[in-house]
């Protein structure tokens, strides 16, 4: 059960990191 929770945390962290990088690149292009 704890493995499943850690898996979801890892997926959520990777998704947040990817979306943060995407928004960062968009803001750099706008400047």
From Swiss-Prot:
Q: Which GO terms describe its biological process?
A: photosynthesis
Q: Name one GO cellular component term.
A: cytochrome b6f complex
Q: Which Pfam families match?
A: PetL (PF05115)
Q: What is its main location?
A: plastid
Query: Membrane spanning segments where?
Result: 3-23
Going by the UniProt record, its keywords in alphabetical order are: Chloroplast, Electron transport, Membrane, Photosynthesis, Plastid, Thylakoid, Transmembrane, Transmembrane helix, Transport
Q: What topology in the membrane does the UniProt record assign?
A: Single-pass membrane protein
**Subcellular localization(s) per the UniProt record:** Plastid, Chloroplast thylakoid membrane
Q: Record's InterPro entries? A: Cyt_b6/f_cplx_su6
What GO MF annotations does this protein's record show? electron transporter, transferring electrons within cytochrome b6/f complex of photosystem II activity
The entry's family comment says: Belongs to the PetL family.
Q: How does it assemble?
A: The 4 large subunits of the cytochrome b6-f complex are cytochrome b6, subunit IV (17 kDa polypeptide, PetD), cytochrome f and the Rieske protein, while the 4 small subunits are PetG, PetL, PetM and PetN. The complex functions as a dimer.
Function, as annotated, reads: Component of the cytochrome b6-f complex, which mediates electron transfer between photosystem II (PSII) and photosystem I (PSI), cyclic electron flow around PSI, and state transitions. PetL is important for photoautotrophic growth as well as for electron transfer efficiency and stability of the cytochrome b6-f complex.
**Under what name is this protein listed?**
Cytochrome b6-f complex subunit 6
UniProt lists the gene as petL
